[in-house]
Amino acid sequence: MDSPPGPTAPPGLTQGPSFMASTTLHSHWNSTQKVSTRAQLLAVSPTASGPEAAAWVPFPTVDVPDHAHYILGTVILLVGLTGMLGNLTVIYTFCRSRSLRTPANMLIINLAVSDFLMSFTQAPVFFASSLYKKWLFGETGCEFYAFCGAVLGITSMITLTAIALDRYLVITRPLATIGMGSKRRTALVLLGIWLYALAWSLPPFFGWSAYVPEGLLTSCSWDYVTFTPQVRAYTMLLFCFVFFLPLLVIIFCYISIFRAIRETGRACEGWSESPQRRRQWHRLQSEWKMAKVALIVILLFVLSWAPYSTVALVAFAGYSHILTPYMSSVPAVIAKASAIHNPIVYAITHPKYRAAIAQHLPCLGVLLGVSSQRNRPSLSYRSTHRSTLSSQSSDLSWISAPKRQESLGSESEVGWTDTEATAVWGAAQPASGQSSCGQNLEDGMVKAPSSPQAKGQLPSLDLGMQDAP
C-alpha cells in the first residue's frame, strides 16, 4: 500500500533544497530552547534532513521577487514615520492643554504612547530587513522585536477596552464614577494594563510557544504555525483573553451607551422646552460625540488586526500548509498600521484636540483649518469649570455635607470634565415625568444662546461628528 504523500509546498512556490532558509541566517538559531518548536517545523518539510533540517523555517524565501520586499519595506517605513510623528503630536498636545489634561484622557495618552513605541520599534527593523531581503538581527533581535510587537499590541487593545468602559460608566452609571476619576486610580489602571500585556507576552521566553520569523522572513512574531498542543494552547488563550474577550466588553459597552442615550431622548420627548433641558441635551450630545470618537478608533484598530488574526486562526485550525509568505507578511503590515489611526481620527473629529493643536502648534492648526477664534481652550475651560463647581455647591444639596465636600474636592483635584460632573446630578433625578427632564442638569453649564427655532422644540440628538457647542 502506498504511503500518503507528504505536505506540499505553498502555492506558487517550488519545493526542494531552495525550500530551506539561509544557513547563514539561522546558524545562530540552534539554541536548546527552540528544540521542540524546530522539531515540529521539521515535520512539515519532507526533504529536510541533517544540518539543513535544524535551520528549516516554515516560510521559504525563494520565488519572492525583490520588489515585494521593497514595496513592503516602503509601506512599513511610511507607516512608521506617520505613527511616530502623529502620536508624538497627540502626546504633546494632550499634555500641554489644560482642557485635555484629565485622568480619563490619560488613557488616550497611554494609547498614543503604545502606538508610538509600536512604530518606533517595528518599522525601522522591518524596513532594514526588507532592504536586504532577509532578517538581519539574529535570534535575540527576532525575539525582542516580536516581544515588543506583542506587548505593545496587547497594551493598545486593553487600553481601548478601558476607554470603552470609561465612556460606559460616565454615560450610563455616573454615580459610580464619584471618586473614581483620581489621578492615582488612573495610574493604577494604566499599570494594570501594562502588567496584563507583559503577562501574555513573556511566556514564549520560557518555552510556552516561541518567537520565530514569519512571512518573508523580514519580521518576527509568536509561533502560530507549529501544530503542537502546547503552542495551540497558547494561541487559543492569547486570542481569548487579549482579543475576543476585550472585543466583547467593548461591544457590550457601546450597546449600553446607545441604549442609555436613546432612552434618555425618549424620556424627554413631549415636555415643554426649558433652559435646563437644553443644557442637558447639549451635554448629552457632547458626551456621545466623545464616545463616537473612541468608537471609531476602536473599530479601526480591530479592522487592522482582523486579517492577521484570521491568518493565525487558519494556522491554529491546522491549515498552515495553505499559507504563503505574502499571506503572513501583508496582514502583519496592516496590523502595525493600526498605530497611525489614533492621531488621524482625533485630528478630524475631536473638537478640543483640534483647538489645542491650533493653540500649541499653530502651523498644524492652519493645515487642519481650525479658526483662530478657537485657539483658547484653556481660558474657556477655566471659566466653565469654575462655573460648574460653584453651581454644583447648590445643585448637589441632596448629598450630605461631608460627601458633597468630598465630591467637589475630588472634582477640583482631578479635573473632571463638565459632562462627567453633570452626569452625577442627572442620574440622581427621577427616571420618569417632567422632573426627569426639566431638573436633571441644573449645574453651572454656560447658558446656551437661545434661538427662535429652539424655543418650542427640543433639539434632536446629533449623531454626526460636528464639533460640540
Curated annotation (Swiss-Prot):
Annotated Pfam families: 7tm_1
Extracellular side: 1-71, 128-143, 209-237, 317-328
Glycosylation sites (chain numbering): N30
A single BP term in Gene Ontology: phototransduction
InterPro entries: GPCR_opsins (IPR050125), GPCR_Rhodpsn (IPR000276), GPCR_Rhodpsn_7TM (IPR017452), Opsin (IPR001760), Retinal_BS (IPR027430)
S-S bonds: C142-C220
UniProt KW Transmembrane helix keyword: yes
One GO cellular component term noted in the UniProt record for this chain: perikaryon
Superkingdom per UniProt: Eukaryota
Cellular localization per UniProt: Cell membrane; Cell projection, Axon; Cell projection, Dendrite; Perikaryon
Cytoplasmic side: 93-106, 165-187, 259-295, 350-469
Molecular function GO labels: 11-cis retinal binding; G protein-coupled photoreceptor activity
Bilayer topology: Multi-pass membrane protein
Modification sites for N6-(retinylidene)lysine: K336
Transmembrane segments: 72-92, 107-127, 144-164, 188-208, 238-258, 296-316, 329-349
Keyword tags: Biological rhythms, Cell membrane, Cell projection, Chromophore, Disulfide bond, G-protein coupled receptor, Glycoprotein, Membrane, Photoreceptor protein, Receptor, Retinal protein, Sensory transduction, Transducer, Transmembrane, Transmembrane helix
Protein family membership: Belongs to the G-protein coupled receptor 1 family. Opsin subfamily.
Purpose: Photoreceptor that binds cis-retinaldehydes. Contributes to pupillar reflex, photoentrainment and other non-image forming responses to light. May be involved in the optokinetic visual tracking response. May be involved in the regulation of retinal hyaloid vessel growth and regression.
Name this polypeptide is given: Melanopsin
Species for this entry: Phodopus sungorus (Striped hairy-footed hamster)
Lineage of the species this protein comes from: Eukaryota, Metazoa, Chordata, Craniata, Vertebrata
